[in-house]
Amino acid sequence: MITELYIDGQRLDLSDDIDIRLTYSITDIENPVERKGTVSRTIEIPGTPSNDNVFGSIYRFDQWVIGFDPSVRVNAYVLQNGVEVFNGIAQLLAVKSDGQFKTYEVGLYGENVNLFKQLGDSELTDLDFSELNHEWDGSNIVDSWTNSVGSTGNDYYYPAIDYGQSSFTRTQAPAPYADVFTTADFYPAISVKKYLDKIVSGAGFTYESDFLTSQWFKQLIVPYGVSGVPYLTQEQMEGALFYIGLSGGVQDIADGTLQKVNMATDTPSPFFDGGGYDTTNKRYTPPYNADFNIQVRVNVQPNLSLGFDQTVKVYVRKNGTTLTQIIEYTWVAGGGSTAQQLSGILQMSLTTSDYVEVWMDFSVDSGTPISPAPYVRIFTDGTYWLNQISGTPLMQPGFIWNMNQTIIPKVKQSDFLMYLVRMFNLFIMPDKYDPKKLYIEPFSDFYDTSNYLDWTGLWDVEKGFEVVPCGYMNPKTYKFNYKDAGGYFEKRYQSAYQSSYGSRTYISSNEFSNGEQSEDVGFGNSVMVGFSPSPRIYARYYDMDNKGTASGGDVELNVKPVTPNLRILYHEYIPFPSETEFVFEGTEYTSYPYAGNLDNPYNPTYDLCFGIPRELYYQSDETSGAIYRYTNNNLFNRFWLDYVKLYTDKDAKKVKLFVQLSAVDVLNLDFRKPIYINGTLFYLLSVNDYDANSDESTSVELLKVLDLAPFEPTVFQLTGGIGAFISDEPKPQLITE
């Protein structure tokens, strides 16, 4: 057997008995955060002249190292009979000498290009989503409902989520009853896949995945969650300001007249207009509601010096009617007519439906006409400007959503990615030839049991085997939890059941096992709430102070917005199950932009909960006879149940044995392919200390593939049945108040 080692492209001299042992493990795929890659034990390389040249004579402690840098990663690969069995990096650990011979101690490590380590402390806010910037208007909102990531791909979506806006009905009103919405009630969400693609590509990786490119996954979104309500960015606030100068040279205002001042010059600097000033009509309309300081400065002079008082007044006129005086000055009789620079400031509350203008009047206290006619002249250095007083105003429809500054939550990219791994039990395997190309699938889709490797003839029977029942070696309890989200309904559920909404606890039947394993997800779950008998079911993110009673006896809830945590939802534009209306900007719709934990709250197929919630805060629409349903096709049953059974079932077992692997067998190692030995399929867990320079058989660890009955989802009606069970989960209690 010929073994060759190349470091930095140079072949090294090896001793005949060199020991190069390599280990491969599924742990790198199951737990990508702790990925180590293929590793070897320390190997000893003889100190031949040729090897001295490769390592730059580093053994000469009295000389500088020439060429070789031990602090830099260098490529290394191992060939066995011309077949590559290892490709990674080499690290020089030490040079030893017994006085006669010297040896180089070298560690070989698989190219551990770890996506999670590469991401480091980078946050979602470090990613650039500016290509998703768009105007906050009704057409973009409606367009997202049918033209979002679920179809051609805007990558943003406007779901109907109750953040505490007044437009959302929270009454027990009879159907049909219309919720009436405007643009201001909808905030954008970004697709989970958009986040994922940005994270992976931003780190310099690519991926292949049937699951992550499936239509179902594309329907997942992260809703708006930066604050309880959207505020303007500093840039947007600055865009509302202006500094305007007098236009047209000078302006004369005759005695006894009230005129609009020609403030219309917005260039060159220092003049500017943030976008709200109409230079044609010489008026300003604010792009958001706020308190502003309006400041006016004029340089004025009467054309005559008279023996009468001459008075000039400057006003801010609001909405064409209300005049508020801001400046007044009088040239007293006989006091001359020198030019005066006058200024004033006015604090005024303005909304987006208001506009303001600058007006001026001039009067001479003569009692009789004067010839030539007196007037006051405004000179070119007159100015007019506006500043916001304080605070951060709410965003208003018509503004541009700056997705980088107003939408993206402050969460580590590595955490976001790991939340997805835990939700869907994702296995991440790098390509053997390109470690920055990743294959990502849930456990349920990762293995191809029809495409296995037959190692029956490689089994070294004479070395025996070991079978270990898995049950007692693994935790007895498995817990799957969403993060507590903090709204009224989340806190209510947490108080009643001491667990987050949609969590799941699985307890194995093995009496010898103990311990607990938790798979905690940093997303908050979405509690769906409907107020019976209305068919409208929304995710509702708010806190509640108390209850009150509205006129007519309808129950009204006093709500207050909360800052929502990072959440994940499924979105779909779905029809109502019974007669009702969804009114947006004056148009009636019979479907609505749903988002929640179910793919359809009336007749679901999938659930983003890990388990069936113990309580649901809505029920079937008995008035119309529409019977709603729920499903146990949740995250645990879809993605985790079979995996957990592999380690907890009475037939679960690990097998340790020896196989005679060749270089070609190692080259063809693929953890996605099960191993077939004597009529039994196994998942490959590890190949331990494969010696590239030995004919000895190699220890491998296998996990038996169980013949488990496929999970059959159940869809059940939401009508009574308290105390009944769906498989091993209790049916939910239906809460109507």
Predicted regions and their residues:
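Short, structured beta-strand/loop micro-motifs enriched in basic residues and often containing a Trp
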Residues: 55-57, 652-661
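Viral virion structural and adsorption modules
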Residues: 711-737
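Extracellular jelly-roll beta-sandwich "head" domains, especially the C-terminal globular C1q domain
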Residues: 234-396
